[in-house]
Every structure is written in structure tokens, then in C-alpha cells.
Regions:
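Acidic catalytic patch
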Residues: 102-119
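Short Lys/Arg-rich cationic patches that frequently serve as NLS/NoLS or arginine-rich RNA/DNA-binding motifs
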Residues: 189-198
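Short, contiguous alpha-helical
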Residues: 8-20, 27-73, 116-181
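Helix-adjacent hinge/juxtasegments
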Residues: 64-107
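Short secondary-structure junctions
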Residues: 24-26, 103-104
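Active-site rim elements
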Residues: 1-7, 82-86, 131-135
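A late-sequence structural motif
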Residues: 182-186
Length: 198
């Protein structure tokens, strides 16, 4: 059974691989405004670091703390090179991983948490739901990073869950991963299905 902790581990891995891929472009390309939600590669990655920090240290601990301003206004006077951005991402990942080890049980994930909507509405939910929100935020922004890389004719790292978690990058698939039944040869036709007669 896949948990939100597994999904957070997955987005950590994606975030790190996408960061390293984008970092090879050089600082100028890494910080160039590309017209996406957070403007540049740099700001997207730092935004995700602040988002995770807020979820893990505040919301998942049940503290209805308003969003820190840095979530939307990434400081320009800090993280002024690739090394500093990488360090920030690794610090946040280490902080998250430490908590995720403790939270990786159904009981811990079911504990009460909070999520602050529109800066002023604290919503009651479970720790699991708060982490699910953090996962979706990551996937949305990493999709932007993937699109920016494609626009620059840079092949992004694979985002396939199956490849990363089931096959562990092995291709063709090992025999142990293959389905034992027959492969369907016909694809169902699109269109409306007739209701069954009773």
C-alpha cells in the first residue's frame, strides 16, 4: 500500500533530480524569468522548500500558523548561487525525512493537523491530508520545471512512478515484474456503452 510518506519520498527524489538537471544550465539560465508561476527555476525550487517546511513543521504538527511570506516572495538577498539553493533543498529534505520516519504508521498519519487556506482560514484535517496537499503542490510545480526544460531542449529526468519505484530504472522489466496473464490484443472501442438489461 502506497502512503503519503512514500509519495513525499518520491517527490523529494524528483525535486533533487530536476534541480540537478536545471543547475547544469548555469546560474543565468537558472535564474531567468520564464513566465511560470514562480518565474525561474531558482524560485520554483525555493518555493517548494518553503512549502514543505510550512507543511512539515507547522501544519502537520497541528499549528495553524499563517503562511510565511517567503513562500510567495522568495528572498533575493539569500540563496545567491546554485550551492546555496542545493543546501537549502537538502536541509528541508533532511528535516522532512526525520519526521517522516516517525510518522510512517496509519496512527501517526491519522493524527489531527491543520491547513491554512487563503492566509486566514485554518482547516481541520489529518496529517495524511496535509501531506497529500504538499505532494500535489510539488507535482504541479515540478511539471512546470519539466516544461521549462523541454522548452530548452533539455531531456528532464523520468517522472514515472512505475520506473522509479517498481522497476528501479531497470529496462526491459525484470521477469518478476511482469504480469502473468494474457495481454489483451483488442482495445475497447470508444463510445457509449449500452446499459445492461435487467
Amino acid at each position: 500500500m502506497v502512503t503519503t510518506i512514500d509519495l513525499m519520498d518520491f517527490v523529494h527524489e524528483l525535486r533533487e533530480d530536476f534541480f540537478e538537471c536545471a543547475a547544469t544550465l548555469g546560474w543565468r539560465e537558472f535564474t531567468k524569468d520564464r513566465g511560470v508561476s514562480m518565474h525561474s527555476f531558482r524560485d520554483v525550487f525555493l518555493h517548494l522548500a518553503y512549502v514543505e517546511e510550512q507543511h512539515v513543521t507547522e501544519f502537520c504538527e497541528g499549528r495553524p500558523t499563517p503562511w510565511m511570506p517567503e513562500v510567495m516572495r522568495i528572498p533575493k538577498n539569500r540563496y545567491v548561487n546554485v550551492v546555496e539553493v542545493r543546501r537549502r533543498l537538502r536541509e528541508v529534505r533532511a528535516m522532512g525525512d526525520g519526521r517522516f520516519k516517525k510518522w510512517n504508521t496509519p496512527e501517526e498519519l491519522a493524527k489531527p493537523a491543520v491547513w491554512v487556506a487563503s492566509k486566514k482560514y485554518p482547516l481541520r484535517l489529518t496529517r495524511d491530508s496535509a501531506l497529500a496537499q504538499c505532494v500535489t503542490e510539488h507535482l504541479l510545480h515540478l511539471g512546470e520545471v519539466e516544461a521549462m526544460l523541454w522548452q530548452l531542449d533539455v531531456e528532464p529526468p523520468t517522472t514515472f512512478w512505475i520506473d522509479r519505484r517498481v522497476l528501479h530504472g531497470k529496462w526491459p522489466p525484470p521477469r518478476s515484474a511482469l504480469y502473468g496473464g494474457p495481454l489483451r490484443t483488442a482495445v475497447p472501442r470508444a463510445g457509449r456503452r449500452r446499459p445492461r438489461r435487467r
